[in-house]
Amino acid sequence: EKAGRTAARLVGMAEAGNIGRVIIAAGSLDARDHSDRIKGFRAVLKRDFPNIEITPVIETMDQPRQMRELLSERLRNDDGNTAIYNVGAGNEGLVDAIRMNGRDGLSVCVVHELSTCTRDALEDGTIDVAIDQRPEIELNRALALLQAIVDDLPPPPAPELIPAIYLRDNLPNEPL
């Protein structure tokens, strides 16, 4: 939920008190991480940014092609969209849809995970924010847990993982 709450705060700040309308894209509402992010996103908007409307969620099955088609349709046919929040994968399709349809009226676009695609899109202004859950740390934690299980040891401590928020201005120097 924290990642969704963070995304909502960023969208709310970008809207700066104006009337807004956000498109949410999710791989699947049945995926717990996606539904948790949406729950956190909705909670913050409802509490702190009631001026921002949420349109019906687009389900893309995390497929770039489906994302491109569904988001393009929404951007072409729904007036007044001011923000996009993608809770899942399929960012290649999201980037394609925005590039094909333009950013007219969009104040902010927030996605998850820093990849080559999202890095390029941040650099050229197609998207604005990538919230990175730092998958390399999650993977290392999972491996350490598996090793502890194999060695019949208690699980290692796992401090809370704070996501990194990337903008075009603070991208890491090393390539992805």
What are these regions (language model features)?
Residues E1-R21, R68, T118, R134-D151:
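Hydrophobic alpha-helical segments within soluble ligand-binding/sensing domains
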Residues T116-T126:
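Glycine-rich, charge-decorated loop segments at or immediately adjacent to ligand/cofactor-binding or catalytic sites
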Residues L45, R134-L176:
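Hinge/cleft segment of the Venus flytrap/periplasmic-binding protein
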